[in-house]
């Protein structure tokens, strides 16, 4: 009952906010960045100005990953998906250009970030620079699964292998971590994932709405100590 009351209260606050935005008239564009939380058990990195930690002489670069339905650019700095094209969906009607779901440009940011945080997580205070054995990974015609491993070794010799898992005909992307700890220390860390998007949309993504707050709203989610994370649609609210 308390959970239901809390959900109704959150919905009421959101509706009141939209009414106030419409009444205000003058909209203010902001060049800030918002994040959509996927899962979190510790404080997530909050700034792109964090230091970059990498393997010796390793430079961040973009890795190309292709399946029959996805064309990705994965940044070895943190293992962030910088770009994602949906090959089966055109950007416009009768266009041969695929729809770009995720993109990273100086003017606009929409990324899928993930990492390990916590006291011993490599993403806690910096974005590690991983190394990859290939510049390009392509799912073969006779393959059902494509695995893209990237490796990072910290100053203590702990080895982190972050592997992206893609399957034929599917759009979901799995992430697997393997941690090899040669030290006597017990390591504590948690996985986090987030979608990071600029508030101000470029023209090709602008839906025409005059309310900037609507651009980044994706629906509501609620959880408590008694109930698991659950997503609610507009109809449920």
Curated annotation (Swiss-Prot):
Task: List residues traversing the bilayer.
Answer: 7-23
Listed GO MF terms:
membrane insertase activity
**Compartment(s) of residence:** Cell membrane
Tell me the membrane topology, using the record's own terms: Multi-pass membrane protein
From the UniProt entry, list the residue stretches annotated as the region Disordered.
Answer: 34-53
Q: Which domain of life is it from?
A: Bacteria
In the record, biological process GO terms are: protein transport
Would the keyword Membrane turn up in this protein's UniProt record?
Answer: yes
Q: Where is the composition biased (Polar residues)?
A: 42-53
One GO cellular component assignment for this chain's record is:
plasma membrane
Function according to Swiss-Prot or TrEMBL: Required for the insertion and/or proper folding and/or complex formation of integral membrane proteins into the membrane. Involved in integration of membrane proteins that insert both dependently and independently of the Sec translocase complex, as well as at least some lipoproteins. Aids folding of multispanning membrane proteins.
| Subunit note | Interacts with the Sec translocase complex via SecD. Specifically interacts with transmembrane segments of nascent integral membrane proteins during membrane integration.
Q: Which family does it belong to?
A: Belongs to the OXA1/ALB3/YidC family. Type 1 subfamily.
Task: Output the NCBIfam families linked to this UniProt entry.
Answer: yidC_nterm
Q: What is this protein called?
A: Membrane protein insertase YidC
Q: What taxonomic lineage is listed for the species of origin?
A: Bacteria, Pseudomonadati, Pseudomonadota, Gammaproteobacteria, Enterobacterales
């Amino acid at each position: 009952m308390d959970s239901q009351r809390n959900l109704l209260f959150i919905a009421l606050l959101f509706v009141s906010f939209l009414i106030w935005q419409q009444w205000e008239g003058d909209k203010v564009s902001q060049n800030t960045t918002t994040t959509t939380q996927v899962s979190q058990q510790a404080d997530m990195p909050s700034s792109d100005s964090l230091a970059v930690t990498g393997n010796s002489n390793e430079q961040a670069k973009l890795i190309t990953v292709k399946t029959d339905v996805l064309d990705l650019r994965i940044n070895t700095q943190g293992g962030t998906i910088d770009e994602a094209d949906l090959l089966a969906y055109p950007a416009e009607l009768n266009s041969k250009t695929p729809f770009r779901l995720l993109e990273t440009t100086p003017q606009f940011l929409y990324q899928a970030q993930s990492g390990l945080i916590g006291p011993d997580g490599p993403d806690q205070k910096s974005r590690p620079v991983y190394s990859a054995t290939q510049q390009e990974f392509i799912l073969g015609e006779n393959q059902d699964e494509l695995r893209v491993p990237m490796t990072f070794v910290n100053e203590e010799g702990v080895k982190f292998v972050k592997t992206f898992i893609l399957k034929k005909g599917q759009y979901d992307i799995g992430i697997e971590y393997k941690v090899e700890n040669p030290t006597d220390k017990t390591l504590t860390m948690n996985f986090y994932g987030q979608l990071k998007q600029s508030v101000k949309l470029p023209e090709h993504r602008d839906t025409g709405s005059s309310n900037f707050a609507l651009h980044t709203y994706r629906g509501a989610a609620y959880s408590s100590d008694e109930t698991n994370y659950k997503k609610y649609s507009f109809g449920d609210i």
